[in-house]
Every structure is written in C-alpha cells, then in structure tokens.
A protein has these predicted regions:
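N-terminal pre-P-loop "Q-motif" helix
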Residues: 1-12
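Walker A/P-loop nucleotide-binding motif
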Residues: 18-36
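Sensor-1/coupling segment of RecA-like P-loop NTPase cores
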Residues: 26, 105-141, 145
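Conserved catalytic segments around the Walker B and adjacent sensor/switch elements
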Residues: 43-56
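Conserved NTP-binding/hydrolysis module of P-loop NTPases
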Residues: 56-76
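Conserved AAA+ ATPase "sensor/coupling" helix adjacent to the nucleotide-binding pocket
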Residues: 69, 140-145, 154-171, 203
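Conserved P-loop NTPase "ATPase switch" module shared by AAA+ and STAND
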Residues: 86-110
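C-terminal alpha-helical "lid" subdomain
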Residues: 152, 156, 168-278
Length: 278
C-alpha cells in the first residue's frame, strides 16, 4: 500500500507541476487528506508557490489559498475580486500549486475562477468525498475539465496488518479473529477509517468484560469520519504555505492522542494471552 501511495503521490506531483487540474475522488476516511499533506510536504514553496487549504467550500477559501501561495502580492484594502485579479496575474507569471482539501459545494463562482487558473496557470488538486453514486453524479455537474483520479483503497490483508499494528502500538487488548473481521468489513478498504477506529477504541466506554462493543465502535467511527468535515466548517480553515517543515507535516497526518477521547485503554495492558471476544 505504501509503495502504491508513493507512486500515486509522485505521479500527482508531476502533473500538478505541469499545471494540470485534478480531482482526487474517494470515500470518506480513505486517506485523501493525508495524501494531500504528503504532497504539500514534498513541494518546495521557495521555488514553487504552493498552499494547502484544509477546507474548501467557497471562492474565498480558494482566494485565501492563493494569498498564502503568493505572499508577495499585496491584497490589503482592496475588494476580493480585485485581489483575485492580482493573484491571477502573479500565478500567470510564476505557476504554482493549490491543494484544496474537503472540496465541496462547488458554486458557479468557484468553478468559473478555477477555469481561469486552468491551462498551465496553477496546478490544482481538489480532494472530493464520493461515497455513493449520487455524490459521483454531483461531481460530474461541476468538474469543468479537471481530470478524475481515484484514491486507491487498501486490500483486506493490508488493512488487517494496519489494524493489528496500531492496536499493539496503542496498547489495546488483543483483538480476536471475529472482531478483526467485523472491523475490516466495516472499513471497506479505507485506511483512515482504521486509524480513526483504533483512536476511538482507546476509550473505556467501548469495552466490557466480555470484550469490545464492535457494533458501537463501527457506528461511532463511521459517524466521526463523516462528520469530521462538518466540524471543520465551524472553524477558520487552515491554509498553509511557506517553507516546508517535514516533521510538522507528518505530525499533522499522524493519529491524535487518546487524551482527546477521555479514558485511555493504552495504560491498561491486558494480561498475557488474554483475548477479548464480542
């Protein structure tokens, strides 16, 4: 899986530097955000203007990303429309790259401006959540010529290895074969789902004396994955640019601390050979 992602990342980087516009399509929790962060860490803003937008739901989010990619452009005291004109001129003079995560609700204004950045002006990669055919059809209505790239899903064997490695690293009680099978079925190839699931499983409320409450963990993980973007909409979107700090970029894609969920099972190691069953 890692090799496949490295190859995809290298391919996307080359295409973005050529000014292509791409849409990374995949289900929620499949790892699109982590891939965009890795791409951001690989690009060198000192020679290639680049910005990463954590949430992209409006034209102003795209404008803010361009402002971060071209910090030398003065957009103070002018209208946002005038600011976009100055930023477009800067991009026309030095092509850059925009990484637009959580891209949704594309308005005609957003699509129109992205069209103006097409044709070698700025490479754009938009990460779009697609979980069903209805969402896929919705993307077709505003794709404006951007090429679609499918986010690869992990095999069952790859997911099982990740699940067991994370469970051991986080100090979770041993998971029996039936529990693993149910979690892998719910994950449906999504690496990010397994990461979120094991984070949640650190909380004591998901465990009983007979073992983990698998159905509850699966429901809460799915809800958490689907609601994550909605939570982000309530805060100021994170936009990054400037000199890359590789360690920071990696930490942003790493699992968060179990303290976020209160009680932490990692401090309660199971006795040797103990196996929980659902």
């Amino acid at each position: 899986m890692q090799r496949q992602l490295r190859e995809l990342s290298a391919s996307l980087e080359g295409r973005l530097l050529r000014g292509e516009h791409l849409m990374l399509l995949g289900p929620r929790g499949s790892g699109k955000s982590s891939l965009l962060q890795d791409l951001y860490a690989q690009l060198h803003p000192q020679s290639v203007p680049c910005a990463f937008s954590a949430v992209t739901t409006s034209l102003d989010h795209i404008t803010c990303a361009l402002e971060c990619a071209y910090p030398g452009v003065d957009t103070r005291g002018i209208s946002r429309r005038a600011a976009r004109m100055r930023l477009w001129n800067a991009a026309d003079g030095q092509a850059g790259v925009l990484l637009l995560d959580q891209f949704r609700g594309a308005s005609s204004a957003m699509v129109s401006f992205l069209r103006r950045l097409h044709g070698g002006i700025t490479g754009v990669l938009s990460a779009v959540d697609v979980d069903d055919e209805q969402e896929r059809r919705g993307v077709q209505s505003w794709r404006y010529g951007a090429m679609s790239v499918r986010m690869p899903l992990a095999s069952r064997r790859q997911l099982r290895r990740l699940l067991l490695e994370r469970a051991a690293a986080l100090g979770l009680p041993t998971l029996d074969a039936m529990t693993c099978a149910r979690l892998l079925a719910a994950a449906r190839g999504r690496v990010g789902w397994i990461v979120r699931c094991t984070e949640l499983a650190r909380h004591e409320r998901y465990w009983r004396t007979h073992g983990p409450l698998v159905s509850v963990i699966c429901l809460d993980t799915e809800a958490d994955v689907r609601c994550d973007a909605l939570k982000m909409l309530g805060a100021n979107p994170e936009v990054r640019s400037g000199v890359i700090d590789r360690s920071r970029a990696e930490s942003n894609s790493a699992p968060s601390s179990g303290a976020r969920y209160g009680g932490d099972l990692s401090t309660r190691r199971p006795s040797a050979g103990r196996t929980h069953r659902d």
